Amino acid sequence: MSRAKLEQLGLELPLFPTTSVGSFPKPDYLVRARADFVKGKVAAAHLRELERKATAFWIETQEKLGVDVLVDGEMYRGDMVAYFAERLPGFTEGGLVRAYGNRYYHKPIVTAEVSWPGPVTVDWWQFAQALTKKPVKGMLTGAYTIMDWSFNEHYPDRRSTAMALAAVIRKEVEALIAAGCKIIQIDEPALSVRPEELPIAIEAMEYTTKSLDAYFVTHACYGEFEHIYPGMLDLAVDNFDLEMSNSDLDLLEIFRRHPFTKDISFGVVDVHSHKMETREAVRRRVESALTILPKDKIWIDPDCGLKTRTVEEAIEKLRLCVEAAKSFRS
């Protein structure tokens, strides 16, 4: 059904479509400029010019590699939740909280009714899409994850916070669709953190995507999915983007016990390691997927965003994805 939906949207993709989860490493010149901007040494207009330059580089790079569905690389974003919290009325900035390793972010605080100020991602999607004839994914963070990664000082409970955010994210989805976006990824990395709250995440996603004309992807990672599977299949999306290689394909055994009914963006390279996989290792991962999953439901991509790798590493890991996909098509 999902491939039929893509065709209805005017998208003709090959078997084993290749894509990326969202983020790419920022070039050194942009890293320096972002730091200088915070210090007041770089004007906003100049920073935006450099962000556009870096975005164009990654669109061109993906095209040269032969990636099928592109991403803008998020050159203009830092943290995936803070980006939205900084732009949505109702949030204030909290103190620094460790995200993972030695990476920190200012944990947002919901202090008033959240609202939609107008599009906060559409201009960047339009810029990226204008650079290519291939489809570019719209990239959003889901309502449940924004709620879970924020403090709440306004709403009576976590569900009402998530649903208020779902109403806001839906407006952004509608704006992307109105601009011509046909594939929209709504990231929910917090999906498996509190298994007892899966119904909240499902309800929030249902509100976000219901009756809207797009192909929806969600990316979830870092979790123990056995606690929420197969219930998570009720999430109102067409495609789950899952971190498979970093978990040694453990999820495949869960799928063996209960069929996976969605399309899957199957992570075949580990984004947390500087080590480069061999072509043979990547092929074996795809072969393992094919023992359980139908070939017309498998997309191929990295495990997660590539922003923590070097530019060179990110390119090579993407190249491995594309080479694997092409080898299985033939």
How does the language model describe each region?
Residues 1-330:
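Domain-level signal for soluble alpha/beta catalytic cores
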